[in-house]
Regions:
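Catalytic or ion-translocation cores adjacent to nucleophile or general acid/base/metal-coordination motifs
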Residues: 25-62, 69-149, 220-221, 234-241
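Intrinsically disordered, low-complexity linkers and terminal tails enriched in Pro/Gly
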Residues: 18-35, 173-181
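Extended, H/D-rich, highly charged conserved domains that either
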Residues: 1-20, 213, 220
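Long, compositionally biased intrinsically disordered regions
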Residues: 147-375
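Short His-Asn-centered micro-motif
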Residues: 65-67, 210-211
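Beta-sheet entry/capping signal
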Residues: 59-64, 205-207
């Protein structure tokens, strides 16, 4: 919990070797337990993953499946900067396993029989976005065929440009003055033992949008939205809608409420001052030398020393799907119904024309919103 290097398990190993040390999907016993996935499981998972992302074609030659994680040291709250949906771990394993399954030729044959035709020259890459340094790691690239060498070079050039631009944007939020060493200062924060604010995590989160990506493409959402590319017209029986509303939407609400509570009343719902923390076993932290284990986020995760960085707002959820389908998910799932009927989040529906058309008012009732004319 107070590691002085980011990942002690791989510290000192060659980067190329680390990139090849990945999860295996073949069924085998490990420690007396079965691991891996049999052929039927792989096909079912591949179809579920692609349909959940509305990624059923056409496919590019290289498709990045990118998880996220953070790089910090001497930080007992490091898991709070990793993936909430991964239980406080990075998304590396998920991305690499998904890529391996989707690159399996037998899986692709079975997917074609289910209406998803992945071209033979499409290769999926498991990747990891380091949200502290904005480096994008590409895994298992030694398995890329020689025919994709130019594609890989172009991808790396584009990623390098995107990384540079994002670091400059992040620097402003971190109070780093723009200059020749701006990007290096962003990276240095990830290795600084004394840094209490290596990155802002999900501070500022305010909305969750499940709709075709075309609805938000080109709009600057300020890094405050959880986005899901979802097309309800491709969603048979609205199974994907149920998955989105019962899993990522719920997790996003939990994250939002954690930031909300840690901002409005850090003494009760947050973890207090990170500088005063003492780690207790592997369980949590105390503020000072006594008291109860702290919950929530430390003060430094929501405040920069002079102002709040997080604006405490209940999550606004916008979903493009028929009202009947959304109501069906609410009616069948207590965890969703409790969130929306008790007003822990705001729920809105987007019409097929792309307009926010209805607001949820509780107990499966909706209020139609007036359409405003453009000036």
């Amino acid at each position: 919990m107070t590691r002085t290097v980011h990942d002690p398990n791989t510290d000192g190993l060659d980067d190329d070797l680390i990139g090849r040390l990945g999860p295996r999907i073949e069924p085998r016993p490990v420690g007396g337990r079965a691991t891996g996935f049999d052929p039927a499981q792989r096909v079912a998972m591949a179809e579920a993953v692609l349909r959940a992302m509305s990624m059923t074609g056409p496919f590019a030659r290289l498709v990045m499946l990118t998880g996220h994680g953070s790089t910090t040291v001497n930080n007992p709250h490091a898991s709070g900067l990793d993936c909430g949906a991964c239980g406080g771990h990075t998304g590396e394993a998920n991305a690499r396993v998904a890529a391996a399954i989707l690159n399996d030729p037998d899986v692709r044959v079975a997917l074609r029989q289910r209406g998803i035709d992945i071209p033979d020259d499409t290769v999926f890459l498991g990747c990891l976005h380091d949200t502290t340094t904005d480096v994008i790691r590409l895994f298992d690239i030694e398995q890329l065929p020689a025919s994709h060498a130019d594609d890989l070079r172009r991808l790396r050039a584009l990623l390098a440009k995107a990384t540079s631009l994002t670091r400059l944007e992040r620097a402003a939020l971190l109070g780093i003055a723009r200059g020749a060493a701006t990007e290096q200062q962003v990276v240095t924060r990830s290795r600084d033992w004394a840094q209490v604010r290596p990155e802002w995590g999900l501070a500022g989160n305010a909305s969750f949008i499940a709709a075709p990506r075309a609805r938000t493409r080109g709009i600057d959402l300020g890094g405050r939205s959880f986005l899901h590319d979802y097309d309800w017209q491709q969603d048979k029986d609205f199974g994907t809608l149920q998955l989105i509303m019962t899993a990522p939407m719920v997790v996003a609400s939990w994250i939002n409420l954690q930031y909300y509570g840690s901002t409005v009343n850090n003494a009760a719902f947050g973890a207090g001052n990170k500088v005063l923390h003492n780690v207790v076993g592997t369980l949590g932290v105390l503020e000072g030398n006594a008291g109860d284990l702290k919950v929530g986020l430390p003060w430094q995760s929501v405040h920069d020393g002079s102002r709040f960085v997080h604006e405490p707002l209940r999550l606004t959820v916008l979903i493009e799907a028929p009202l009947e389908a959304i109501n069906g998910v609410i009616a069948k799932n207590d965890i969703v119904r409790e969130l929306v009927d008790h007003h822990w989040l705001h729920l809105y529906a987007i019409s097929p024309q792309g307009r926010v058309s209805h607001a949820y008012r509780g107990h499966l009732l909706w209020q139609q919103l007036e359409e405003r004319s453009e000036p």
